[in-house]
């Protein structure tokens, strides 16, 4: 989903960068030394310089991934006043409200503007780990358009 979103942005001349947390070894947030870890410092800089951030996350146990929550804890104030959207992937349709806890936290803790067009996908939207749903592609396109419009206002 993140790669398709980046394609949507690039097709409109909007720069896009994907950061895959699987490729960024992060320490667990310990409230102390973890904040000075080189990867944390690098990601904090990237986040603080971004205007719009779209978070792509799997949903586990009715919540965003622990890796994503750890990133937010480690990079804290870099999130101040960001425009944030969500791409969520879950096994089934019943957790569609699950991202609200994280969205509320970003909104209240860091005054992020949350794009009210979440993309929520289920296993039915994929075939062989590839997007197969026209409806999902359309929802991602609408998220790209909404985030670009909000960014430019």
Listing of model-derived features with the role each one plays in the protein:
Residues 1-2, 39, 98, 139, ...:
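Hydrophobic alpha-helical membrane-association signature
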Residues 1-13:
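N-terminal beta1-alpha1 ligand-phosphate binding loop
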Residues 7-8, 45-46, 146:
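Alpha-helical scaffold elements within enzyme catalytic domains, especially in hydrolases
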Residues 11-12, 49, 78, 150:
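Alpha-helix C-cap/termination motif
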Residues 13-25, 112-121:
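Short beta-strand elements in bilobed, periplasmic/extracellular small-molecule ligand-binding domains
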Residues 18-38, 126-129:
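N-terminal beta-loop-helix "entrance" segment that forms/cooperates
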Residues 35, 42, 113-153:
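Glycine-rich phosphate/pyrophosphate-binding loop and the adjoining helix
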Residues 35-110:
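Helix-loop-strand module that forms the ligand-binding subsite of alpha/beta enzymes
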